[in-house]
Every structure is written in C-alpha cells, then in structure tokens.
Amino acid sequence: MNKNYILLIAVLLLSPFRIVGQKEVNTDDTILNFLNLKFGMFIHYNMGTYQAEQWAYPFHDPKDFKPSQLDCNQWAQAAKSAGMQYAVFTTKHHDGFSLWDTKVSNYDIASAHKKYKNLDIVKEYTDAFRNAGIKVGLYFSVWDRHHGMEHGNINQENISFTKEQLTELLTNYGEINCIVIDGWGSKWGNGPDFEELPYETLEAHIHSIQPNCLVINHSCRPDLKYTQIVHYEATHGQHCPYDNTIPSQQGPTLQSTWFWEKGYENQELKSVDEVVKELNFANSHYSNYLLNAAPNEKGLMDENVLTRLKQIGDATMLSAPLKKLPEIKPVHQGISVMASSSSGKEFGANHIIDADLFTRWQYAQDDNERWIELDFKSPKTFNRVICGEYKRAVQEFKIEAFINGEWKLLVKGGNIRNNFNASFETITAQKYRLTILKASRLPYIAELTFVKY
C-alpha cells in the first residue's frame, strides 16, 4: 500500500473533522455546542402512558392511545420556565408504536381513533419547542418488539425498516440536534447487539441526512466506540464520575418513573435542591443534564410538574460555557479496588467503578464479611454516594470512610435497589468501603460512585 495513502488514513482517524458527502463537519465543535446547552427536558410519552407500563406490551390496540388535550406548547413553556435549552421526545419506544404517520407500518398514531388520524405528535413537539427557542432532539428505540426487531432475529429487512423510519424523522422535522437511540447493545431487554446491527451502520445513515445530529446511544456504558455522547443512566445508579472527562449526558427523572402513571399528579417530585445540585455537578464535569418530565394521559404536564419546573428555573443559574473539550481519560483512573471475595472473574471487584451498568461485583457464596473497598491513593473529598444494584437482593448495608486509623460510618441503609443516592457530611479520606450486612440472596452490585456536590 502507498505510504502516503497510509498516512492519509491515519490523519483522518485522528482528526476532529468528518467528511459527510462534500461537507466537512467539525465534530468537536458539535459536541462542545451540545455540552453547552447544559440543561434539557426528556419527554417520555407514548403507549405506555395509557397502560401504566414502562415497557408497554407491543400489541395494544392503537385506539388505546387517546391524547385528548395534547398541548406540546404547554410542555415547551414548562421547559422554558425551568431554563432548559434542549429537549428529547420519545418518537417510538420498545413496543414499536410510532407517534408520527410512518409510511412503513400501520402501528402508529394514524391508526389511533379517527379524531387523531391526522395528528403528527412529532411535528407538534418539534414546532412547539422551536417556537419557544429550545433545540429539539428525538428518542428512538431500535429494539422494536411489535415489528420483530429483536436480538437473534435481525435481518436486512428489519434493518432497512429501521433506516426508513430514521429517514422519515430526520427528513420531515427540520434540524434535529441529537437522536437518543435506545435498546441497542444493551443487556436489558432483547434488542440488537453491535454485531447484528453495527453502530457504524446507523451512525453513517443518520449523518448522511443530518451531519450535525449527534448520535447518543443509550447503552449504559462509557464507551465512545458506540456513541458520540455517553448517556449516564441516573435511574439505575450510573452517575457521572467525579473525574469524568467524557462528553456525556446524565438522565434522571422528575417523577419516580419514565412514563406517567395514575396518581403522579399528587406525587412528591424530585426536589429543587436535588435537581440544582445534580445539574451543577453534571455541568462542571463535561456532562449536560437531561431531566425527564412525563406528560399525563391527556397529553398535558400535571400542575405539580409545572410548578416544580418553574421553581427549578427560579433557583438555577447555568454555568459559563465551556471553551474547549478536555483530553478524554478513563473514568475512576488510579483507584484500586479490594473486596472480601468475588464469586468469579465475571464478577470481579473492579466492575464496581467502571461506569458500566452491565458489569457487576458479587461476593462468594461462603463470604461472611462481604465488603468492597475503594482506595483513591490520595485523600478525596466527597459528600454523596450513589450505588446501583441488579435484582434487588440487598436488605441492609453500610458505607464508611477510613479516617484517623478507623472506619467511620457515613450511611446505613436497607435496600439498595436500582438507585441508592444519599448525602452525608463532607468527608476527606483516601479509602471508602461498602459492606453488605444482610441479603436475601447473592446480590449483584453494578456501581459505587462517590462525588461532591
């Protein structure tokens, strides 16, 4: 091979620029501009809203979808009142019901009740948010149970189906700031993996239509091989690390779940103080903050949501824009991890700090001590701990810091579950430890993260 050709390939691989058609796109600038949006609204609204299902059954009657008072302008004004600068809307979730009149399926809004036949909710959303001065993004699930887009069943026909739907979304609704893709390369559910549906296949397709649309793969791992922006799944104990330099997005919920359910109109929501602290931390660690606010079955935001978003806006002052991207380094660099035991190589201690929800630590069956310790190699100051567990086995635990030659209790709790998140007095220490005191069976601990708000 010609040496000059080899050199050209090397330069292209290292360059922040990407050639799309005849257009040169500076991906670093696109990513920097996205991070500087700081604060966004995630909007989960789809068939699950009407079924009290977070993963809706994929064969509900389209006529069950009844947005009787849909008002996307209300959503947009709510986002504006909170100081949000972009939004992401669920065009299609894992059940495969599309909220636009897709030409490749009848399982969509056009097949709902006749009064909604001409309703295009994606257009209603994009128009309303643009008119409010808010950038628009879309959410799209490639795991589509209605149309058979599932692991082990991926073929050229359903890949073409997926591409055609993405073409519709990226052609008919103006400039799309980002597209969050879910159900892809994830161990939750049964979506396609990256061998069945290579990341490059969809990224290239998306960028052939909209070169500046960021592809954000919601795969719950800090790996830029499969995404342009890492999405930290805050609802499952995956928190932006204290030393994060990866361009990222953190996604918590204002209500207790992604989709609205009956009774949420009276629910105690995430507090203003929590949101402001999480937002400020994310923004100071190369991450923007995408807060989910779910509309109700009428297609409206509940009054408690409207009030809370306005309170958040009154309490929020966004930080100054980033001027450049940092050098990207692995998360939790330099930390050593020790554990009382591990049940096998697959469940090694280091998994607890890799920011990957699908790797986990598990102690051995005969372990009576059941602790895992993080040594930061030098004193670090923290006041919050976040821990995520898979399958909910822990019944009692404690978290400690090693100070003046002894372990000092920081937090004691019962269940960890998906997302244990607690504050403690500000402490400076080199070593921190989690001990499982009681469990119904061998637990799987996905992440243990310490930060300072």
Label for each model-derived stretch:
Residues L442-Y453:
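Exposed low-complexity, polar/acidic, P/S/T/G-rich flexible segments that act as propeptides
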Residues M1-K23:
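Bacterial Sec-dependent N-terminal signal peptides
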Residues A393-G405:
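Short, surface-exposed beta-strand/strand-loop-strand elements in extracellular ectodomains
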Residues H351-L357:
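Acidic, glycine-anchored loop motifs typical of Ca2+
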Residues A429-K431:
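Extracellular Ig-like/FN3 beta-sandwich strand-entry sites
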Residues G21-N350, Y363-D366, L374, T381, ...:
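Mature catalytic domains of secreted/periplasmic carbohydrate-active enzymes
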Residues E389, A401-I403, K452:
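Residue-level signal for short segments within beta-strands and strand-turn junctions
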